[in-house]
């Protein structure tokens, strides 16, 4: 991302082919190499391997209070169900034509991500965590896969 990118374009929302993302940044994001420094945070105990992804404060405020209170109960993670399902978030937001991207994120994406994190809390187990680790590796290799639908049939329904 470019310096001061939060004050340009769509702010904290990144669209497909966003002018703020450099070519090198696109490579890092696509391969998820940009996440390697988070391993240090896992070792320090600041985050876990599986859990809700940390978000910027301005995006955090978009989540309904009832969901925020639940998400606060567990440590953030390097990957999780939201990371897998929203692997293509940039494409989803880019496809939005008749609505402001921030508004769409607030009305549709943030509440659904919150429901996914609550689903994770309600179903947290070694088995679920191992499946999420496996699925994370798969979405890096095959970004368009929908294998999570085979592993987790009881996920909240998505209305967009």
Residue ranges of model-derived segments:
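Conserved small/aromatic sequence motifs within transmembrane helices
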Residues: 1-160
């Amino acid at each position: 991302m470019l310096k001061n990118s939060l004050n340009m374009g769509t702010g904290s929302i990144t669209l497909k082919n966003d002018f703020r993302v450099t070519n090198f940044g696109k490579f890092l994001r696509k391969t998820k190499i940009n996440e390697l420094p988070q391993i240090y945070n896992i070792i320090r105990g600041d985050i876990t391997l599986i859990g809700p992804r940390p978000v910027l404060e301005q995006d955090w405020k978009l989540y309904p209070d009832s969901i925020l209170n639940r998400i606060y109960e567990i440590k953030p993670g390097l990957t999780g169900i939201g990371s897998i399902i929203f692997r293509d978030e940039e494409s989803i937001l880019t496809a939005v034509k008749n609505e402001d991207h921030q508004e769409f994120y607030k009305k549709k994406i943030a509440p659904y991500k919150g429901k996914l994190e609550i689903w994770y809390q309600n179903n947290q187990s070694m088995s679920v965590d191992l499946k999420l680790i496996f699925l994370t590796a798969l979405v890096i290799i095959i970004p368009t896969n929908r294998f999570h639908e085979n592993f987790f049939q009881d996920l909240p329904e998505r209305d967009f």
